[in-house]
Amino acid sequence: MDALLIQGGNPLAGEVRISGAKNAALPILTASLLTAEPLRLGNVPHLKDISTMLALLGHMGVRVTLDDKNHVTLSGDSIPHKEAPYEMVKTMRAAILVLGPTLARFGEARVSLPGGCAIGSRPVDLHIKGLQAMGADISIEHGYIHARCKRLQGARIVMDMVTVTGTENLMMAAALAEGTTVLENAAREPEVVDLARCLIAMGAKIEGAGTDVITVHGVEALHGAEYSVMADRIETGTFLVAAAMTGGRVRATHTSPDTLEAVISKLREAGAKVSVGDDWIEVESTGKLDSVDVRTAPHPAFPTDMQAQFMAMNTIAVGAASVTETIFENRFMHVQELRRLGANIEVSGHTALVRGVARLDGATVMATDLRASACLVLAGLVAAGETTIERIYHLDRGYERIEEKLTQLGGRIKRVH
């Protein structure tokens, strides 16, 4: 099993090109199920979750052509298997996203209940309730969601809680429904907006994406399109925190500053110098940072997927700060690993109190989920001596060639098999 070896102490410097966003690419890939015509996508990152999704779509009958490095063409003119089997769903919760488009276009779908990171329960009942409100007949048997309908009907759907994948699933389903669907308490995340833009390019009629009320006027059919996936705001944020922690100067390019306002604000509060252009963000730091309180909440507030990275930053900052997680349960699994490096962290319920220490010491640690593994990489970059991170397959689910990109910036990091 692969591991990362990191020699800490080098400031990072230079430019890093940000990859396409995994959490935007996954729903956009499933949008290929909504049309018989080819969908050509650019800026698709090379990640485990992406290849898993492409394998699932291929299993269902979508013809997948990898045109070049980051382009993929999906042709869904024939979908003989309207099913997402457990073997393909268990490693990736985003597979639930095939439910809405498959049901809307074909009137039937069978999807295994999802797996993925072990953080929180992430209930799929909001997806199911929404589709039922649109007229679907849904049952759960033997671990599978069975859904049937004639043609989905537009409906007013009020989400009990903000759900990104739920909003995306229902938005795709509503695109082919008869009549108008209104999604209230919809997720406002940039990835939801990116999916809406792709669907609009395919002929969908959608208003309000990026607000908490999305209106979808159903159409008879969608057509093919060319679309480029948005930049990964979480990868961007991770490199910016790495620059701040190591006392370096890093410019992240091919990214979208307007999707990261909460993160940029917190970096400035910590004492880092942040400059912003149209498609780049630069962080310059002495490495001497102030602790910052962080509270996760749905967009546009501070993103849960940056919580672990800011906890790592707080471990070596001056003072004490609280990190509060309001989105997912079980999202402090990195705390015990950071403690192995010498961090001073106490957890009480959904809040961790982090007291900065003078230095971290390298040790062997274990990645427990995607963002936890990123925070351990950041800690390893500043820890004295060598840090070994095991189980980095989690990292490969969400970061494209992270060790190569960090090496180009001056980090001493290598993958061992």
Curated annotation (Swiss-Prot):
Family: Belongs to the EPSP synthase family. MurA subfamily.
EC top class, as a word: transferase
Gene Ontology CC terms: cytoplasm
Pathway(s): Cell wall biogenesis; peptidoglycan biosynthesis
2-(S-cysteinyl)pyruvic acid O-phosphothioketal found at: 117
Record: residues binding UDP-N-acetyl-alpha-D-glucosamine: 93, 122-126, 305, 327
Protein name: UDP-N-acetylglucosamine 1-carboxyvinyltransferase
GO terms classed as biological process: cell division; cell wall organization; peptidoglycan biosynthetic process; regulation of cell shape; UDP-N-acetylgalactosamine biosynthetic process
This enzyme's EC code(s): 2.5.1.7
Reactions listed under catalytic activity: phosphoenolpyruvate + UDP-N-acetyl-alpha-D-glucosamine = UDP-N-acetyl-3-O-(1-carboxyvinyl)-alpha-D-glucosamine + phosphate
Annotated phosphoenolpyruvate binding sites: 22-23
Entry annotation: catalytic residues: 117 (proton donor)
InterPro entries, per the entry: Enolpyruvate_Tfrase_dom, Enolpyruvate_Tfrase_sf, MurA_subfamily, RNA3'P_cycl/enolpyr_Trfase_a/b, UDP_GlcNAc_COvinyl_MurA
Pfam families: EPSP_synthase
PANTHER family noted in UniProt: UDP-N-ACETYLGLUCOSAMINE 1-CARBOXYVINYLTRANSFERASE (PTHR43783:SF1)
Cell compartment(s), UniProt: Cytoplasm
Protein purpose: Cell wall formation. Adds enolpyruvyl to UDP-N-acetylglucosamine.
UniProt keyword annotation of Cytoplasm present: yes
GO MF annotation list: UDP-N-acetylglucosamine 1-carboxyvinyltransferase activity
Key words, A-Z: Cell cycle, Cell division, Cell shape, Cell wall biogenesis/degradation, Cytoplasm, Peptidoglycan synthesis, Pyruvate, Transferase
CDD domains, A to Z: UdpNAET
Chief place of localization: cytoplasm
